[in-house]
Amino acid sequence: MFEQIVEWIKQNYGDARKIIEIGVGHRIDVAEQISKALPRTEVLVTDTNESLVRSREIGRVRAVTDDVMFPTLNLYEGASLIYSLHPPGEIVQALEKLANRIGADLLVVPISDERHDLPQERWRELVVRGRILGWLLNKRV
């Protein structure tokens, strides 16, 4: 599934200056794949766990400690896409608020088919090859 997300991001954000993953946790491989697929794009990952962020040997991907509930806005400025893989439901509203503030699209990839009560008038399913990969709040795509 994550390979399909990387391919979709490559196809739809090939001209992006910056793409950000929020709540990277232990899974850095998706950001690394995006960085390889889009070598001219800055790929940034954030997490609230400072020791986890400091432990990253991640090549071109930059890792920063930040909390989406109280974001450091200048980190996110210029991003075309913010995405989060399997975020806890309680941060989805903060993700949406941040994306709206900086004018970025937001992709939320929940665990299985969970929707976190996303308002249908603003969010749409991201379907690739007949499979729902996530939920998109977008300005561009």
Model-derived segments and their meaning:
Residues 79-93:
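A short SAM/SAH-binding and catalytic strip from SAM-dependent methyltransferases
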Residues 70-77:
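Short conserved loop adjoining the S-adenosyl-L-methionine
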Residues 44-46, 114-141:
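Active-site capping/gating segments
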Residues 1-17:
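S-adenosyl-L-methionine
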Residues 26-40:
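Conserved SAM-binding loop of SAM-dependent methyltransferases across substrates and taxa
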Residues 15-27:
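Conserved class I S-adenosyl-L-methionine
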Residues 58-70:
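Conserved SAM-binding strand-loop segment of SAM-dependent methyltransferases
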Residues 103-117:
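Conserved beta-strand signature within the Rossmann-like core of class I S-adenosyl-L-methionine
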